[in-house]
Swiss-Prot record:
Subunit note: Heterotrimer of A, B and C subunits.
Naturally occurring in which organism (per UniProt): Bradyrhizobium sp. (strain ORS 278)
PANTHER family tied to this protein: GLUTAMYL-TRNA(GLN) AMIDOTRANSFERASE SUBUNIT C, MITOCHONDRIAL (PTHR15004:SF0)
Protein EC: 6.3.5.-
Name of the featured protein: Aspartyl/glutamyl-tRNA(Asn/Gln) amidotransferase subunit C
Gene3D superfamilies with a match to the protein in the record: Glu-tRNAGln amidotransferase C subunit, N-terminal domain
Gene from which this protein is expressed: gatC
Annotated keywords: ATP-binding, Ligase, Nucleotide-binding, Protein biosynthesis
Length: 95
């Protein structure tokens, strides 16, 4: 996979990063190098290797699934600037 100049500009726009035309070739090379490294990783034989979620073995602490105080939705949303039907209202952030 190779990244072209138009893709670099699109990524910069999506990330809201100002990129000049002079910077595009350098970033294109950097992104292509990263993708080449990821392609190398796909060649590694991982058959029989257990997936890891941490470098040290860990177990999640579990709690009893019991009913606690409920019906406090009004208390939860009372400090929110905008709510509707006990849901938080937030400004639209996706174009």
């Amino acid at each position: 996979m190779s990244v072209d100049a138009a893709t670099v500009r699109k990524i910069a726009q999506l990330a809201r990063i100002a990129v000049t035309d002079a910077e595009v070739p350098h970033l294109q090379g950097e992104l292509n190098a990263m993708l080449a490294f990821v392609e190398q990783l796909s060649e590694v034989n991982v058959e029989g290797v257990e997936p890891m979620t941490s470098v040290t073995p860990m177990a999640m602490k579990k709690r009893q699934d019991v009913v606690t105080e409920g019906d406090i939705a009004d208390d939860i949303v009372k400090n929110a600037p905008m709510t509707e039907n006990n849901f938080f209202l937030v400004p639209k952030v996706v174009e």
